[in-house]
Swiss-Prot record:
Pfam families: ATP-synt_B. GO terms for molecular function: proton-transporting ATP synthase activity, rotational mechanism; proton-transporting ATPase activity, rotational mechanism. Keywords: ATP synthesis, Cell inner membrane, Cell membrane, CF(0), Hydrogen ion transport, Ion transport, Membrane, Transmembrane, Transmembrane helix, Transport. InterPro entries: ATP_synth_B-like_membr_sf, ATP_synth_b/b'su_bac/chlpt, ATP_synth_F0_bsu_bac, ATP_synthase_B_chain. This is ATP synthase subunit b. The gene is atpF. It comes from Pseudoalteromonas translucida (strain TAC 125). It is a single-pass membrane protein. It comes from the Bacteria.
Length: 156
């Protein structure tokens, strides 16, 4: 056996093997590797997008929470102002009602006082007439006259 022929045979066999591998084995392996690389890149890109979306959603949620707190504070402030306004209105209305009741009371008292005064005047007039009748029935006597006047004063 000749060493050169063996080496040339091995070189030809190796070249055929390499060409066969490059033609039939390497493209599917290379395609699988590229597909895997693309899948990994897509996964990383999706992960980055998801991370950005999560960050954006967290910012949006924080902003909405902040807005909700501001709105809640505004609603509470408006409710407090409305409560103060209602209390003030009711206080004014209560004072007006009190003044009205007091005025009615004064009016009723004045009316009752006028009625009692008128009644007393009528009684005094009646007593004066009765006293005058008694005086006229008796003879005009100083002692009897004094006695009748004292009785009238006692009745008044």
């Amino acid at each position: 056996m000749n060493l050169n022929a063996t080496l040339i045979g091995e070189l030809i066999a190796f070249t055929v093997f390499v060409l066969f591998c490059m033609k039939f084995v390497w493209p599917p392996l290379n395609g699988a590797i590229e597909a895997r690389q693309k899948k990994i890149e897509d996964g990383l890109a999706a992960s980055d997008r998801a991370e950005k979306d999560l960050e954006l959603a967290q910012k949006k949620a924080a902003e909405q929470l902040k807005d909700a707190k501001v709105q809640a504070a505004d609603i509470i402030d408006q409710a407090k102002k409305r409560a103060v306004l209602i209390v003030d209105e009711e206080t004014v209305r209560g004072q007006q009602e009190r003044e009205k009741i007091i005025a009615q009371g004064h009016s009723e008292i004045e009316s009752e006082r006028n009625r009692v005064t008128e009644e007393l005047r009528k009684q005094v007039a009646t007593l004066a007439v009765v006293g005058a009748q008694r005086i006229l029935e008796r003879e005009i006597n100083q002692a009897a006259h004094s006695d009748i006047v004292e009785k009238l004063v006692a009745e008044l």
